[in-house]
């Protein structure tokens, strides 16, 4: 992959570079994904998650930019794995962009075949929000992480993480949310990363409090704050596959244990034991097969240590990076003895159509986001947990790139909020249109048997019709851009998922599209969980009037 040293930053204000606000939104969000404040390796078009890219290569990036600048408001741009391949006449209520990233026929859906295609320039890895142009930096996963640790606290620690120690690893674009999510819940956390730059970035953005290269110092500080029942986050430089076994050897057992290293990609994401970053890069280039094998062996040691901590009483869970599957394939037959975070903590929210709803101020003015914060505090005042989140986010979350906010809203709530935002754009309360989107990790848009759809009640973990239906209904209902991806979060062969974005530009046409899309999108989450037999989803569907023909 050619590296290009250029600083990309989304335009701000109300002057259009394109022929309409929806096209402008797509252009600005593509560029925002590659803003140095947002992207992990913008010079390689990598946004987050190992090699999750916004475009296939620099030539394709420029062609997408040029296409969006000339795209008419009754045309649709098609993007195949980060490359613009067609512009067709459609209609004004159709999506302006349709994206399909990293999709492979199941028999060939593995990293080896993907890498062959990538080497030939035929495919890119889109992760979830990298290739769908709606990544907003670490805040994008922060509330979900906050909710996960909050639910763990409710289930196991009387509602708070005060006086507890969490041990985790991985401080990249996704995992970087963990330190702040734990301290927001009152806890102490040691977060390990092998890359000093990742820790420095989290400290710079106020997601992590301190840095150390010493395990002794990390443990001393952690124990001091744990005894005081005060929160602190400690970024520890090191390899988790070395540090966790060492803690087991010393008989040190944290209260919670999880992991968000880039284990989904053994070649580009995980660093084997005993290698510096430079040595790992050299081996990756010279002998990728050996590199992958060493990575898998290290992951197995990593999971063995997590299991040992679980046996000693630690609340242990997989945070969706497929590390258990790798260890299992390497012969660790009890790798799945600790659960994934969705069945352990998040699924009840999915049953209510809740998920990581986000919005971005195209103006670039933080005041536009602060005004929308006030809408949440006013319109959803009865949801104290949500309002607490908004207040904490305002105080503690630093914007990356265009100002944005995330919060988990459910069926009915998303459409209500979207209507209000569109009205605020229409009457000038907000200085420019707002982009509304979400992660692919949502209630009705993903099939991922080792993550979002793990341990479904009816055994339908691997049924991938649901994300396809989600993308289809969002497209016909007028989402601004819609994406269908493969392999996000957990790697090739293990997930299919869909994304959508809708632009609130203040027009009456946008109001109608918003109503349709922000109803059907979370509605798919309710439907999917009703179909799987979840009572809470059935209650939600009946209460909200979701029309499900065979619901009993």
UniProtKB/Swiss-Prot annotation:
Cellular compartment(s): Cytoplasm
Enzyme's top EC category: lyase
InterPro entries, sorted: Urocanase, Urocanase-like, Urocanase_C, Urocanase_central_sf, Urocanase_CS, Urocanase_N, Urocanase_Rossmann-like, Urocanase_sf
UniProt KW Cytoplasm keyword: yes
Cofactor binding, note field: Binds 1 NAD(+) per subunit.
Pfam families registered for this protein in UniProt: Urocanase, Urocanase_C, Urocanase_N
EC code: 4.2.1.49
Enzyme active site: 407
Cofactors named for this entry: NAD(+)
Catalysis: reaction(s): 4-imidazolone-5-propanoate = trans-urocanate + H2O
GO terms under cellular component: cytoplasm
Functional pathway: Amino-acid degradation; L-histidine degradation into L-glutamate; N-formimidoyl-L-glutamate from L-histidine: step 2/3
Binding site for NAD(+): 49-50, 127, 173-175, 193, 239-240, 260-264, 270-271, 319, 489
Keywords associated with the record: Cytoplasm, Histidine metabolism, Lyase, NAD
GO molecular function, one term: urocanate hydratase activity
A biological-process GO annotation: L-histidine catabolic process
Function of the molecule: Catalyzes the conversion of urocanate to 4-imidazolone-5-propionate.
Protein family according to the UniProt entry: Belongs to the urocanase family.
Entry protein name: Urocanate hydratase
Organism: Bacillus cereus (strain ATCC 14579 / DSM 31 / CCUG 7414 / JCM 2152 / NBRC 15305 / NCIMB 9373 / NCTC 2599 / NRRL B-3711)
Lineage: Bacteria, Bacillati, Bacillota, Bacilli, Bacillales
